[in-house]
Amino acid sequence: MPLIARSSSSNMFQGLDTMDLVVSRYDESANSIASYIGPILNITPLSGLTTRVIIYSTGQDEPKKLRDDLRHHIPFNVDVIVRQRPNVGRECAAFLHHITTGWQDLADHTLFMQAELHHSWSVRWRMQDYFVPNTGFLSLSDVSEYCSSWDQCWDHSTWSESSDVLGSIYSRASPTLRQGFTLTYRGQFIASRHRIHSQDKQLFQDLLDEFVNPRSMAHSSGYAEHPWLPGKSDSMDRPLFGYTIERLWGVLICDVPMYNWRIDAQVFCHLRLDQSCIPALRSCKTVNVLISVLVTH
């Protein structure tokens, strides 16, 4: 059986108890949010888990009403929690806030997502086929790019980042590694508590400060004048620094080597392994699929 392939039996998840769905929400309706969450809760790997839905809302809704509306629209008996946040930092700040304030209470796995999933069918497919108890990090984006080093990194869009900024983050996240890394997109991924706790909490706290502190480097005029995002301006509710952190979740949570295999000329499996590296090539069946998986003990 492939290392990363799913099992048809929920017994595979014995000993894995909790899963939180952490949602960054602006003003999306409860019905819309539930239309993405409901199908996710229905997939096999989540059956039998104690699951919570945690909404970080920056909208004007009264939290209790939003919570009640979500409970009405989500067709499962799950705990729904709505936490109000200031409209600062978008999803990156919401995720970092969740990690830092709930450090001791993180679920076994957390699905981080925005209120509107990109390619939700692909998210469900990836979770169904590749989410297993020892998953440490699973990118749920339909897009992926690879950077050979932090001082030569750019992607298909107009994004890049200064080597000083990338070098600083990379050296703190992966101080013993000098290898390439895969960029993540869309602000949707799964991370285990084990992998999050493998990092220094202060790193996440310092990154959060870049978003919420108006005097931070990320909100300085010098940073905002970089040429790689033409036509975009920085603000507390739309920080340019968010484009960078969106791409670096794998770096922040997975400080281990990257292994790449190419299958059938067009299929890539990006596997991140804590210990031995075992190609799970038989699990990669679909053309043009980009997967990032970290396997823990």
Residue spans of the language-model regions?
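ER/Golgi luminal nucleotide-sugar-dependent glycosyltransferases, focusing on the catalytic module
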Residues: M1-H297
